[in-house]
From Swiss-Prot:
This is Dihydrolipoyl dehydrogenase. Its main location: cytoplasm. NAD(+) binds at residues 182-186, 205, 238, 270-273. The lineage of its organism: Bacteria, Pseudomonadati, Pseudomonadota, Gammaproteobacteria, Enterobacterales. The gene is lpdA. It comes from the Bacteria. Keywords: Acetylation, Cell inner membrane, Cell membrane, Cytoplasm, Disulfide bond, FAD, Flavoprotein, Membrane, NAD, Oxidoreductase, Redox-active center. Lipoamide dehydrogenase is a component of the glycine cleavage system as well as of the alpha-ketoacid dehydrogenase complexes. It holds the Pfam family Pyr_redox_2. Its cofactor is FAD. One of its GO terms (molecular function) is dihydrolipoyl dehydrogenase (NADH) activity. It comes from Escherichia coli (strain K12). GO terms for cellular component: cytoplasm; cytosol; glycine cleavage complex; membrane; oxoglutarate dehydrogenase complex; plasma membrane; pyruvate dehydrogenase complex. The keyword Flavoprotein applies. The modification N6-acetyllysine is found at residue 220.
Amino acid sequence: MSTEIKTQVVVLGAGPAGYSAAFRCADLGLETVIVERYNTLGGVCLNVGCIPSKALLHVAKVIEEAKALAEHGIVFGEPKTDIDKIRTWKEKVINQLTGGLAGMAKGRKVKVVNGLGKFTGANTLEVEGENGKTVINFDNAIIAAGSRPIQLPFIPHEDPRIWDSTDALELKEVPERLLVMGGGIIGLEMGTVYHALGSQIDVVEMFDQVIPAADKDIVKVFTKRISKKFNLMLETKVTAVEAKEDGIYVTMEGKKAPAEPQRYDAVLVAIGRVPNGKNLDAGKAGVEVDDRGFIRVDKQLRTNVPHIFAIGDIVGQPMLAHKGVHEGHVAAEVIAGKKHYFDPKVIPSIAYTEPEVAWVGLTEKEAKEKGISYETATFPWAASGRAIASDCADGMTKLIFDKESHRVIGGAIVGTNGGELLGEIGLAIEMGCDAEDIALTIHAHPTLHESVGLAAEVFEGSITDLPNPKAKKK
């Protein structure tokens, strides 16, 4: 069965970038159609990414906190995990959010076409779905087709014991021994979940630190804590993977590589993602796609074809949902005739591990590469009353300031709920705040949040909660 429809805007992909673009288009009075390969809206993020991982991380955190409370005089029995019920909880979270999106699409009169969409011309798209073919004629298109996990040619990915992030989130079983390939955010988050559920975790990372994009001093605090849970093999890489009946045998080389191949019950490959740009027949619409699958856009998110836009993972790093959402808003507003641009000063990054690692703006490495003269100020949570009382005093808040203007240009937090504390720093950078602006803002006490203000006081030389290195000598 084949049908044909006409619309002002078609959005290819319904992840956070795609549905945000579609809903914004509808709110601006544009007739809008979403094409989505999943049966529900939300894309990778809501279905097999950000949201289910946070549901499982919540479970992991509760398990770990229950164990830790013994030191405070509250002793529980050994946690008993029911994997089926945990999986049901995860699915409940997903269904609540995807159901909400379906309701908002209906309320906005956004038509949803399920299936795989590919371009057949500059103004036509063909969707292959379970119910047949749908041809969509459009005036404008927004490509939000996302990304997928990287696969390596020497790894037998067809073996069910070789996982990507989607497989790990299915929570089919808890392996006795799990290897995480890649010390980035996805691998560490999944390692956190499976460690809490009982797995022995090895992490192999080719760089000299996990979370390579973050500053070393922040990662050092994190590594000290996480090393008690994971066996970290830094400056090491996997060279061979062999699937046998009794397990997956992995050969490694490098600084921490074992001498012999190691047997694992499962291997999670979490070494990054690649864009889906080559899967759309975008060339038939005249849209240029580079060798890696990325689509180049300008600050209004236009491709080289003026009426076709691209947003989200498919336009480049960082591959983060919140970046894609803002890109989606801009693309919709430009189509509606507004002179808007995507030109953020900062895009925050967060590893939702325990402790969390979060940063925004420039890192020290980036400031050095740009030739910026900078100064850092840190506030250790060991001096925070709230952190000590909440048993999370191993955290740290760090601000990076331009040495001449004293404006904040970057910041990072490592500690419990660190990501929740990052917003003030991001806003300060966007608004051009300097150290004095932050230091003179009264922060509630006792909170973890006040560590941002106290770090600014360290820079200003007005700190009284720590020895003051800038105090006048007597």
